[in-house]
Amino acid sequence: MQVILKEKVENLGVLGDIVNVKPGYARNFLIPFGKAVQATQANIKAFEAQKAELEKAEKARFEAAVAVADAIKDKVYTIAAQAGEGGKLFGSVGTAEVAEAVSNQSGKKIEKSQVRMPEGVIRSIGEFELTVHVYTDVDADIKVNVVAAEA
């Protein structure tokens, strides 16, 4: 199925590209989430008329994402967690806890789906380097310091 992309989609294309995708991917993800429209002659003409407006909106979203990334990057965020002897945590610190800590300590809204933990969840106290994927092609490297919570 051919679709016209209304925004940049990772591993697929950028705004205005006409790409071939599987019908289920188009019907269940791209079209319902407003990322693409079916590539009919009428939609192609309508898209050409809207292209400048969509590019302007995409640029605004990108600039907002860069501003968020600049505000949160290169900072250390502290998370208090229950820990036993030897610095081993009771449980773990995952993406939800990291997103909440970054949101609270920076004032910028971060979703848990934006937090990238390449080594998996954190299970001990210490300082860890993580990445926050703010937007397509916009990542911010952060440090998370997990400390033992006061009893």
Swiss-Prot record:
Keyword Lipid metabolism annotated: no
GO annotations of cellular component type: ribonucleoprotein complex; ribosome
Entry protein name: Large ribosomal subunit protein bL9
Tree of life domain: Bacteria
Keyword set, alphabetical order: Ribonucleoprotein, Ribosomal protein, RNA-binding, rRNA-binding
Database matches in InterPro entries: Ribosomal_bL9, Ribosomal_bL9/RNase_H1_N, Ribosomal_bL9_bac/chp, Ribosomal_bL9_C, Ribosomal_bL9_C_sf, Ribosomal_bL9_N, Ribosomal_bL9_N_sf
Protein family membership: Belongs to the bacterial ribosomal protein bL9 family.
GO biological process entries: translation
